[in-house]
Amino acid sequence: MRAVVQKVKKSSVKVDGKVVGQIGKGINALIGITEGDTLEDIEYLKNKILNLRIFEDEEGKLNKSLKDVNGELLVISQFTLYGDCRRGRRPSFIEALSGDKSEKIYNDFVDLCRKEVPNVQTGVFGAHMDVDIQNDGPVTLLIDSKKVF
């Protein structure tokens, strides 16, 4: 599993012009899933995202986690995180897991996050979405459960 994690002042996602998820201060997490992802990958990514110390403490240092600041989480599926751009000009998405398997893993990830964070919002799995993100910092991190980077 992969994630692009962005600390935000606010973020929202629309499908067909209708807001389906929105948060205030927190994290916008774009999530990609590949063949072979398991509960271990889900747990790793969940623990990393919810406990990353990317929020300021009283001294202005990045020393607090989403959970520490009672932040909100917006989770959006994004298969293009497994796009391979090394050859040619059109990305290949063969590493992205598609269909029901991917949706189940995504839903399992969201469910586990909801057990630890009071406000977890989502986009619509597999839909074309318009995402508005007001970065805070900006702080943007890439996480891979296989520790590729």
From Swiss-Prot:
This is D-aminoacyl-tRNA deacylase. A Gly-cisPro motif from one monomer fits into the active site of the other monomer to allow specific chiral rejection of L-amino acids. One of its GO terms (biological process) is D-amino acid catabolic process. The gene is dtd. Its EC number is 3.1.1.96. Keywords: Cytoplasm, Hydrolase, RNA-binding, tRNA-binding. Homodimer. Belongs to the DTD family. One of its GO terms (cellular component) is cytoplasm. A motif (Gly-cisPro motif, important for rejection of L-amino acids) lies at residues 137-138. InterPro entries: Daa-tRNA_deacyls_DTD, DTD-like_sf. It is found in: Cytoplasm. HAMAP family: Deacylase_Dtd (MF_00518). GO terms for molecular function: D-tyrosyl-tRNA(Tyr) deacylase activity; Gly-tRNA(Ala) deacylase activity; Ser(Gly)-tRNA(Ala) hydrolase activity; tRNA binding.
